[in-house]
């Protein structure tokens, strides 16, 4: 039986939600991942250090007995965010990063930033203290095609910001385009990118061919095949500027299967099996550890995990549940549309 053992991975972009959904999904992450950067777009959002502290306590309370997992908390950047509160949260060790959502870019982002100038005092303080900014890299102006949002964001928001504050450390989250990959590669320091599991596997055909398939709809939306291949090449390259951020985003089925469905794909339960499949296809299993376990901690100034996991290739496909049942309703699990043969187990 073929197997590989790697350091226990981390997830550098995760939605856990709250309440019954949090309680229903957290084990799928904490079973495999040691740490995760937790997204702050709750209702209401996590905008202060006190909010983050309370949310972290709810996450830890929901952990199953025996699971060792560290939630890395973020703040939701608004035009009213206090630089002093951000600095205090970072100094306490509670706040790992601040998240920029352009208003209206994704789920629960209506309270995000509309005028970047109003957020500059916080961003200047973050640059000074070395606190990373995580960005949802899309513009939301109505005259921009949804498939062009990332490219326009780079040109009109991200690049001007980085020129103005070159000391600011920026994570371009869930990169979806070849242009985004090229922009990160060309950058001179202080820029890295997370890549999701699902964007390595699906292109936009998955959403639209054969009928509307809401469980493949996410934001940023999946792009053309050439972009998917560029993401794959970056992920398997070993380049330390690229690392795993699943953007696993649970929604109960009625919020996905409706006339105006929510964006988000739930991948926490089968991400490592999917990634092993992708890296094997690309002849790069030896670089899976870098992408999932090493590059992210290095970027965020943390040590890699000492624990290991083993992925073993099974003769028969590994069976994952089609849905996760939560107290709020069922959440559909990402279907990669190919059999998965890699199974995760803990290792000494």
UniProtKB/Swiss-Prot annotation:
Question: Where is Zn(2+) 2 annotated to bind?
Answer: 99, 136, 174
Q: Which family does it belong to?
A: Belongs to the metallo-dependent hydrolases superfamily. DHOase family. Class II DHOase subfamily.
GO biological process annotation, one example? 'de novo' pyrimidine nucleobase biosynthetic process
**Gene3D superfamilies, sorted:** Metal-dependent hydrolases
Q: How does it assemble?
A: Homodimer.
- What EC identifiers does the entry list? 3.5.2.3
Protein name, as recorded = Dihydroorotase
